[in-house]
């Protein structure tokens, strides 16, 4: 049986995934291990299609990958491009600043340059902050690392991303966690709209690994500091 192919970036964004040493063929972290559960459930090998962030959905639309499995918040702008499975994760969103920055609420960010990934749920949140300058990141091979470096260097004053990756960064001496917004952002696997059979296949496998507790085990292995969103996932909604 043919491999199942998921598109993603190759980046150091622990605990979601770490930078691969072989171009993305071998990956570690919550995202790759959760995807492996689905591949195993389907009896197929798993193949990663590594592309820049803004090429992940086009890769699926072209047929180069079967789905986008890479931090895809289920938001309207993406739902216009692909169909989504049930959620396999639910996260809040946090704002990261440099160490010593006094910002602790959205209104404290007035006049700040705030980075977020183009077209993401994080950018939608950043757009609600009053009087900030939005700095979109999208096209590089490692967009997450680029945003972190932009905060570190002072190119931007803050960045918005999901709490699963920003909260650990806030523990590093050069950064502070400004605040977390309780957005309950659901993540799913995006599949081309003209491949409903692939969507059904992946969604069914996800339902089974959620129902029998296998996904929860992987969650607790990689993200023990975050409670598993059992009710949201087992209900198939956010």
Model-predicted segments: where are they?
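Extracytoplasmic small-molecule ligand-binding "clamshell" domains
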Residues: 1-71, 80, 140, 212
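Short helix-initiation/N-cap motifs at beta->coil->alpha
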Residues: 47-58, 101-102, 135-150, 185
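Alpha-to-beta junction loops
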Residues: 43-45, 61-70, 112-113, 151-162
């Amino acid at each position: 049986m043919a491999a199942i192919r998921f598109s993603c970036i190759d980046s150091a964004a622990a605990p979601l995934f770490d930078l691969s040493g072989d171009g993305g063929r071998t990956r570690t972290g919550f995202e790759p291990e959760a995807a492996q559960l689905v591949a195993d459930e389907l009896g197929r090998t798993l193949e990663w299609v590594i592309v820049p962030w803004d090429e992940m959905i086009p890769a699926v639309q072209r047929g180069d990958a079967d789905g986008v499995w890479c931090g895809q918040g289920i938001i309207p702008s993406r739902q216009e491009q692909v169909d989504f499975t049930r959620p396999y994760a639910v996260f809040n969103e946090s704002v990261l600043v440099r160490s010593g920055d006094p910002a602790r609420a959205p209104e404290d960010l007035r006049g700040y340059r705030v980075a977020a990934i183009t077209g993401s749920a994080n950018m939608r949140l950043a757009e609600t902050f009053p009087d900030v300058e939005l700095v979109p990141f999208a096209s590089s091979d490692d967009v997450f690392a680029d945003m972190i470096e932009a905060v570190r260097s002072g190119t931007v004053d803050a960045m918005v991303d999901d709490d699963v990756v920003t909260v650990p960064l806030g523990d590093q001496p050069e950064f502070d966690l400004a605040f977390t917004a309780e957005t309950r952002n659901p993540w799913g696997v995006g599949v081309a709209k003209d491949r409903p059979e692939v969507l059904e296949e992946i969604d069914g496998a996800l339902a089974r690994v959620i129902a029998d507790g296998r996904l929860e085990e992987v969650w607790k292995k990689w993200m023990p500091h975050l409670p598993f969103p059992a009710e949201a996932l087992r209900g198939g909604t956010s």
